């Protein structure tokens, strides 16, 4: 079963924000989604969920049941659009491009990168960047050829690619 989504992302916006993202992605173990939409700490330690008393999984008198999926999993899927952080980051430009003078208002910067996520693109993370005044232009493809799409500044369009017979045999 295909599990990864390949993305080509280009970001442009206020220099101070773009530089922070760029520097963070250059680190040995970058956490792009966590930087943009931080997951609350308690999601790591919340092993049980409260269920209604009539729910079939409700096994205790306290209304709590062991949850088969950890709280972080559901939170990430809802708030990041993917269960894991971005991985295998490769920059498409060698350097951060600065547009203007960093000591003056209105200075911008831009860079592009390629990465993978689990199952789909991190649309909520991209939306958060757009809300911060950052331009996001991204193309994405499912590794199994089930979908592909384009995201530009809050507008997402995805489709099923047309596959020829050879592609279908390889799937």
Language model features with spans:
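Long, contiguous binding/interaction regions
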Residues: 1-171
